[in-house]
């Protein structure tokens, strides 16, 4: 089934983030001697963060991970005696509040993947930076609760009640901020931010189709951004959201300094000629592999957006399927050297014409991609603003097929409020009363059009080259079968 395959890939893509969860401390949270917190001991209220294993109400940091009493006791028992748990299914059982006792094997594996260990350090002995990240997460959850209480007391994706089993995903090892403990940085080897630690299985090969319009067609309608909700999203929640997304962006992209170093290098004429002389089939495959690498990091970024992992599984998949290509264009804008009209492609600067083929539709696709990426680059956004813009684009609530419209709208409102605050602080209006935000929002229809062009060109290419095998993730994201699963 497509859904299972997709989340298998996500699990492998984010394994390195999960491995860093053991930065949290063991046992109950206690403030170091002499340390006082004016907000009422944030550490003592760490239970506001749901259990990382099953999503139930947590009771503190146990064996290095924020968990509930049930998962704490389960892990203790699993370590105190010789156990030989067996999974009666396929070792991919859902581990949530309702189902956590159904498979001890999968529950233990999830504990271990999150970093639970008998040797984990206590919270008070964590580094100052690690403690601050935990405190930031607590502040974020508290700010979300305040915004929820003021704006929509009836329901919210930030409800502190334990989500129902239907809302808990089997990849719930990432709650809305779980990536915040990661000190991981994506490797410098690729200007696309592709880490060398990604396994070969993640770049398996795959298939494609044309029925993409149904799930990406954009019809301009006025998105209602609840002014009352935004007015209550105070500086606390804005500041933490901005910090969170900026860190997620930094950890899933190559450093901007490294990109600019490549801009300053002399053009590699031999490499440019090599790409210009590639045949249509070779160029498609090479571009698909580069795009797949970028999308793997986009998936990591999405999972670190506060609240994203609490959306339904179907909505998460749909948002990523219809939004990943759009976010790739946004990310391309920071790799574009406007003075050369060239993009950092792997480890070489390539001009726009290097991607042209003899097919007129493909040339149009390349031109539209460069044109849109250039329009973003010309705005000279900061890295933080790019992070917020990616969140805004991904969470655009008017995508066909989404079910949790209210939840997605609330997440979108938070991102909208944060990016508006950031842009108004850093940018003057462009012309008259036209703001940078206006320009960014006007790009949304362009993203939809380019996504459709991509699928049309890809469909035509597959008809002409039926034996070409694309990377697995690329095939899953842009195949007709997987699109039909979501409609």
Curated annotation (Swiss-Prot):
Residue ranges of domain NR LBD in the record: 237-480
Main subcellular location: nucleus
SMART domains: HOLI, ZnF_C4
GO annotation, cellular component aspect: nucleus
Compositionally biased tracts (Polar residues): 157-167
Triggers of expression: The expression of this protein is developmentally regulated showing peaks at midembryogenesis. HR3 transcription is ecdysone-induced.
Protein origin, superkingdom: Eukaryota
CDD domains (alphabetical): NR_DBD_ROR
Alphabetic keyword roster: DNA-binding, Metal-binding, Nucleus, Receptor, Transcription, Transcription regulation, Zinc, Zinc-finger
Zinc finger (NR C4-type): 51-71, 87-111
Annotated PROSITE patterns: NR_LBD, NUCLEAR_REC_DBD_1, NUCLEAR_REC_DBD_2
UniProt cross-references to PANTHER family, sorted A to Z: NUCLEAR HORMONE RECEPTOR HR3-RELATED (PTHR45805:SF2)
Database matches in Pfam families: Hormone_recep, zf-C4
Gene name of the record: Hr3
Biological processes, Gene Ontology terms: compound eye photoreceptor fate commitment; metamorphosis; negative regulation of transcription by RNA polymerase II; positive regulation of transcription by RNA polymerase II; regulation of development, heterochronic; regulation of transcription by RNA polymerase II
Family: Belongs to the nuclear hormone receptor family. NR1 subfamily.
Protein name: Probable nuclear hormone receptor HR3
Region feature (Disordered): 145-176
Record localization: Nucleus
Function: Putative receptor whose ligand is not yet known.
GO molecular function: nuclear receptor activity; RNA polymerase II cis-regulatory region sequence-specific DNA binding; RNA polymerase II transcription regulatory region sequence-specific DNA binding; zinc ion binding
DNA-binding region(s), chain positions: 48-123
